[in-house]
Amino acid sequence: MEFVNLRFFVLICFSWLSFIPIANAKYLLIENENIWHELLQISVASKISEKCTSIEARKIKGLFALLQIKSVAKELGYTDNEINEFVSSEENKKKLKNETDIYLLDNGVDLNNVKIICLFGHSEMDQETTIGSLLRIK
């Protein structure tokens, strides 16, 4: 089954992360900076691949990155139920989308200029960043 776009796939997989606090006073997963940063990287790569026709997402690599995030959450003591509830949070989805746009804007990307988005994506690949590693030239 081929996914139409990685962003939709990311949002589906995003449900693996929990928003519900645990009785033993663990932080919400959304407050875990490392997990949130990794999700943001995947989301930025996804948005670049959606907007730039010369770049595509490395979907399998993105899936493995999401599975790694889930593994980290489990190591932190979050249950499958807690992790699975995170995707269903529309608030978290909106926050990720907004922070993706903010990240791109903060890096000089005009979200209405496809050429600039593509240049940023190519730059990320050239610099071998995490975002760049989730992308490839078509």
Stretch-by-stretch model annotation:
Residues 9-19:
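Bacterial N-terminal signal peptides
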Residues 26-57, 61:
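Immediate post-signal-peptide N-terminus of mature secreted/exported proteins
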Residues 61-138:
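Compact alpha-helical subdomains of small soluble proteins
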Residues 1-10:
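Bacterial N-terminal signal peptides that target proteins for export
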Residues 20-25:
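Sec/Tat signal peptide C-region and signal peptidase I cleavage site
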